[in-house]
Structure formats: C-alpha cells, structure tokens
Amino acid sequence: MAASSISKRIALAAEIGLAHQDDLHVAMEEIADVIGCGLFAHESIPAAFGYIAAARGRVMDCLYMAINAGDDTDTVACMTGFITGAHCSSRDLSPRYLALIDEVNHFDLKEMACQIDAIAGNTPEA
C-alpha cells in the first residue's frame, strides 16, 4: 500500500508548529488541517512532533493541543506525552494531574517509573 513519507510529514508538521509558536490555537488547527490527527501513522506521528515544536516542548501545552485537535486525540496525546515526558521527566507535569491519574487508575506512576528505570539500569531522579 502506498503512503506518504512519514519523515517528510514530520518535517512539515514541525515547520508548521515552529511558524505558529506564538499562537498555539492556530498551530493546533493548522497541524490538524494540513497533517491530520487520525489513527494512521502518517498523520498521528507527524502531528505529535508538530505540537511539540509549536509548544517548545512544554508538556502540558503539547498535551492540550493534542487532546483538543480532534480525531484520534488519545493516540496523538499519548505519543506527545511519551516524547515530552521522557525528555523533561516529571518536572513539567502538574502534581495535581499526576495525583489524579494515580487515583483514577489505582496505581503509582512514580513507583512505575522507578521500576522502569531499574529495568533499564538507570538511577531514577529524586
């Protein structure tokens, strides 16, 4: 099956994001309109990178855009959150949201992160 180049679409999404860093709503709409935010990899992966570029990597801004863009928001928001979360750790996440996630899902994110770090052979940050 023929499909568009994901790497070229990532570059285009990042270009759109960088061009609209001063207006995240416009960035969100442009990325959704030009790139798309659907389930297919050639839309969802570039969209995630476009939101990250637009928001300058700020976790919550990236997530707000990914969630509010429409279409397959859970997929795009998960990728956006994974990428920015891995890059910045938890320092940019609201403690209120972390507590809510733990409470609603009945697990401990911090403990899970420590276990993943241990498996990877890393020393978790305090």
Segment roles from a protein language model:
Residues 43-125:
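Catalytic phosphate/nucleotide-handling subdomain of diverse soluble enzymes
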